[in-house]
Regions:
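Catalytic machinery of carbohydrate-active enzymes
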Residues: 1-196
Length: 196
């Protein structure tokens, strides 16, 4: 029930005692829930104008208007603690091109496959100019191990035993990300590194 959702969302919002909220969607229900939650300053898209809504242009225009600035950039840049970046620097050979391989994925239909990744790594290893880091979730260690078993050379590091906050500096420090999971691609992009 749509009305029940308004009240449950309003109750959830009340818990946080927000003074101000920014709604990046033309939703009357979210607006009403915010009003019911007692939020004083509610900034929102024009209501009932969902048709032909261009998400990027609308967000840019809205943000520029609310912040009273002329132009709002559409890209983000992630900021990573310098100590975390330094802590992973010993894993990188700066004389080589360092690639994070994102072999894990949330669904089986989006996986490129261990054979494809190991073949790619073996082909690139013929040039002797690369280091590789295998990024998989903790429940995908077998994928990382299977790739590593098929790769000739010792220029590969398994990241599957690391948590998210530990792998982010690896992705940000690498020269490139190649993978099927969007997490690595997002971090790579926000770090100004190419991804494929």
């Amino acid at each position: 029930n749509k009305f029940k959702n308004i009240f449950s969302f309003s109750s959830e919002l009340k818990k946080y005692n927000f003074d101000k909220i920014f709604i990046y969607y033309p939703s009357p229900r979210i607006f009403i829930a915010c009003k019911l939650a007692g939020i004083k300053d509610i900034y929102h898209y024009p209501l009932f104008k969902k048709k032909n809504l261009h998400l990027i242009n609308a967000a840019q225009k809205f943000t520029a208007s609310v912040l009273n600035i002329e132009k709002c950039q559409t890209y983000t840049k992630i900021h990573i603690n310098e100590n975390k970046l330094k802590s992973v620097s010993t894993y990188f050979d700066k004389s080589k091109f360092n690639i994070v391989i994102g072999a894990g994925s949330s669904g089986p239909t989006t996986k490129w496959g261990t054979d494809n990744y190991s073949n790619l790594i073996n082909e690139l290893n013929k040039l002797n100019k690369f280091n590789f880091f295998i990024l998989c979730g903790p429940n995908e260690k077998l994928i990382a191990q299977e790739i590593m078993d098929k790769v000739e050379g010792d220029n590969i590091t398994d990241l599957s035993n690391k948590n998210i906050s530990e792998v982010i500096p690896f992705i940000a420090s690498a020269d490139m990300y190649v993978g099927n999971d969007s997490f690595g691609s997002h971090i790579s992009s926000q770090s100004g590194k190419p991804s494929l």
